[in-house]
């Protein structure tokens, strides 16, 4: 009923004479609302995308070698921790409470479009920010979101407290350094964090988080969502973390990182994902911000501010050296053993896994013995061409106008020109108080007079001139901002609400601009588009962000004049408004010392919540200690490789005879690459068993599935393409469980993944063509490689299901493998 009634109102407004228009009607005219969806041309998409990805490319899951599924401590080649992955570490209630508050913080912003392929993502900041490099006049303060949501803001604190406690438990030294550096008045609830970045449905391209504290870490928490994929990837290291709601990743934000693709059955399928990054914005501890805190504090004491300041003095702390540059990277060659050494549930055998990792690097031929093929094949499955993949952004995308102005697309400009008379005095006088109307009339006349003077001066130099040149340092420019201040209070008064909606803001300011443009023509005698809607739109955006001249750069007397005038305008609006007085969400003008006024104590025990300290103990978190050294070459390590038993009647000749003809583009790609041809023409890998091998203390035994193993007690078991020979899923699952019990530590399940590595990025016609031939082609390759007549090939999701998702430590992808081979690390029991 409400929607229907709204439509009727709009219809009435379009036909009613101006004098009968109700107060809110002017700002809800349908033609003036911004376009919800705008179709960009192919050229616009291509230009925006190419410019963005030149500096910030997207990387897909296939571009990374390891996907971590379980708790992980990932280190670089020097042993320095790059990331700690903690699945499910955030309590559900804390995640939900924070999500309910922070969800609206993520708004369309062009400021991060370079990390989203040239398009405005849903992103925002909360807490405190320095606004260095921004046209906002007043620096080093609460974000607008925090200021406007001060009453609900404390619901974020449980999440902050848990995340801080987890950070402290895992990285006590870095936590202490960050805690010592962050100014007390810009802490979020006593934590070492000053700022939150909130992202919604935002697949980030590769970037570093410039401005974060160099001596600390950032913490990424997934608050809510329904999605697959979108792993957080450390691009220079070739690893990514499969995150889901309530997961936490503590990582070095100065490494290049990004999100992999969303894993959707169809590109237009819905998905949702709300994340929050907690960090210390280092500029908030620099002298310029400290001076701003001191200025505000002195002013608060001088006027006897109420409530009183939360602190008596500002302390300049040691903020360390923050270079705002990418951190140096020291990647290493990835192997299944090296990856498994990072998995927390295998920390008791880390030294042994690192020894096996070293052994593989020393003896690359062992890769074939252990896994059936090399970890990297240069002439195997070729990389997909760009033309075979869907765009990162679909052809129809949301194109939003930046905050503070209006959309210049569609019929909005024409509709605004037709209705500009709404700003005439006879239509406003009955709805606004006399004081505010007087300010509007005087400010409008003053600005038009200055515009006319500037125009006449320009025309004396060039009588043929048709366009007005806007001088940003002129009295006319200052008068325009004064006029905007009056208009802003008029909007609030007309709507009887402190926070107009985006549509109401848009409608008001486009009408405002149309009225001024019309007045320049009719009252100043200027050409119709001498000033123009576009130029007024640009200046309105300047006004929204504080003007082109920062308040702090103005002479003291001018600063005082502007602040006092803003105050008088607001008071005039309040005197003329019948609405009850509410909290003023006038963030841009807030120059009070309101730091920490929003802080509240969290009553954990009273609410039946575990305290952060108790929760950390419950999780069993321990500090990341020094890097574990590889086991000595003489330490006993036993690796058992299990091969599928060859079928009695199967021969290489039989396998070759069953190879399908490579007639389609996809079958040629799968079967005719040099590595695939070697498999088809070569000897099967399981025709004969090699003798046991020894490398110091490392012993490698190879046997067939089903052989007697009574006297064998391996540390690690590698199942080499065994599950492909088992038709029934339950039987395959039972076999994994059996070998997991045999292995002392973990099992490496090595199998063909019949799904294309870029499955979720393939154009539909390419995906269909691939799926038509993939299973037959891989069956032929598998039969040739393992001398089997029957095989059932599976996808990664089905293999993970067979191995029990909660027992998966990681997935390793063999790069360029002709069999599209992967290895899953399966931990049979949770080991302390």
Curated annotation (Swiss-Prot):
Gene Ontology biological-process entries: base J metabolic process
Keyword Nucleus: yes
InterPro entries per the UniProt record, alphabetical: 2OGFeDO_JBP1/TET_oxygenase_dom, DB_JBP1, DB_JBP1_sf
Essential cofactor(s): Fe(2+)
Region annotated Disordered, chain positions: 1-24
Enzyme Commission number(s): 1.14.11.6
Cell compartment(s), UniProt: Nucleus
Cofactor note: Binds 1 Fe(2+) ion per subunit.
Region (DNA-binding JBP1 domain): 409-578
Pfam family, one: DB_JBP1
Region (Thymine dioxygenase): 80-282
Domain-related comment: The DNA-binding JBP1 domain (DB-JBP1) is necessary and sufficient for binding to J-DNA.
Record text on subunit structure and interactions: Monomer. Binds to DNA as a monomer.
Protein name from the UniProt record: Thymine dioxygenase JBP1-A
Taxonomic source organism: Trypanosoma cruzi (strain CL Brener)
Lineage summary: Eukaryota, Discoba, Euglenozoa, Kinetoplastea, Metakinetoplastina
